[in-house]
């Protein structure tokens, strides 16, 4: 956190003395923070968060820059792909496919090509950890799902929203897409997309509106290791500490992205109000 504090102060163009005065602490305290000899207390971090908000300091971008710098310091062998992972309580022991079963692509170890989504997923958890990881995909079986209606239906299957048509050819088609695969690669239902996708599942928007949302949002990709073999191919490259203050800014970013998703869904719904089919109509036709 010491580099971030210094970066904030320099962004504001303040000396350590002036910065300390703004935060209601001593020069020596700020000096210890920036030298890494002490960490700000929770109260001090809250004060710093509130001050940065008032001064419109781009802390979220600074967090991304910190991760980018750490990423650029990593050198990988051929065949390895660099990815990001967020954990609510940190990785202990071997990496295993042990997420909740009803995630986008079922139970697995989830990684992203972009840091933003795993960061906002863990921002509400005090003991959360952020990791830069890599995976060797050369010996793994995998399937890659394009960002289209098939992707949304596959997510619906894994989230348990298709049980009413279990046993149909339509259900079996999607239940078998990633069966026996070590790795599933597909778009991320991020903070913006989550609201749009939920609106599709609950019948508020059609498949046409959903597909156009997918195109507009330009979603990043996630890699999901669903087997022990795939998890054994993953290596932790770096752990990036995330402070309480940073988590507050990540919460703000998550809320803002969710609101953008709501706005987007509402706008697209107006344009495609009756074009296409609703989710329940798709399921009814499959019975």
Give residue ranges: language-model regions.
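A short, Lys/Arg-rich alpha-helix, primarily the initiator
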Residues: 1-11
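DNA major-groove recognition helix of helix-turn-helix/homeodomain DNA-binding modules
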Residues: 10, 24, 41-61
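Short alpha-helical DNA-recognition segment
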Residues: 13-31
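ADP-ribose/NAD+-binding catalytic cleft of ART/PARP-like enzymes
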Residues: 58-104, 123, 276-287
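ADP-ribosyltransferase catalytic core
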Residues: 66-68, 73, 80, 97-107, ...
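Active-site and NAD+-binding cores of ADP-ribose-processing enzymes
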Residues: 135-287
């Amino acid at each position: 956190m010491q580099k971030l504090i210094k970066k904030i102060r320099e962004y504001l163009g303040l000396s350590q003395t002036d910065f300390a005065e703004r935060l209601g602490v001593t020069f020596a305290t700020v000096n210890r923070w920036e030298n890494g000899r002490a960490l700000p207390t929770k109260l001090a971090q809250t004060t710093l968060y509130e001050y940065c908000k008032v001064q419109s300091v781009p802390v979220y971008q600074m967090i991304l820059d910190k991760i980018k710098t750490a990423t650029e310091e990593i050198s990988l062998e051929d065949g390895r792909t660099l990815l990001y992972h967020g954990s609510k309580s940190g990785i202990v022991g071997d990496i295993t496919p042990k997420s909740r079963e009803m995630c986008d692509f079922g139970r697995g170890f989830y990684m992203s090509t972009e840091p933003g989504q795993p960061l906002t997923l863990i921002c509400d958890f005090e003991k959360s950890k952020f990791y830069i990881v890599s995976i060797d995909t050369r010996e793994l079986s995998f399937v890659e799902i394009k960002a289209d209606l098939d992707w949304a239906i596959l997510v619906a299957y894994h989230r348990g929203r298709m049980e009413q048509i279990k046993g149909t050819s339509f259900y079996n088609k999607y239940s078998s897409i990633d069966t026996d695969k070590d790795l599933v690669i597909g778009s991320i239902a991020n903070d913006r997309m989550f609201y749009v996708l939920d609106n599709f599942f609950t019948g508020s928007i059609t498949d046409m509106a959903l597909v156009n949302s997918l195109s507009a949002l330009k979603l990043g990709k996630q890699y999901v290791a669903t087997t022990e073999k795939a998890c054994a191919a993953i290596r932790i490259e770096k752990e990036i500490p995330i402070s309480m203050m940073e988590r507050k800014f990540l919460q703000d970013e998550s809320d803002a992205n969710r609101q953008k998703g709501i706005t987007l869904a509402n706008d697209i719904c107006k344009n495609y109000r009756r074009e296409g089919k609703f989710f329940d109509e798709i399921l009814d036709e499959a019975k």
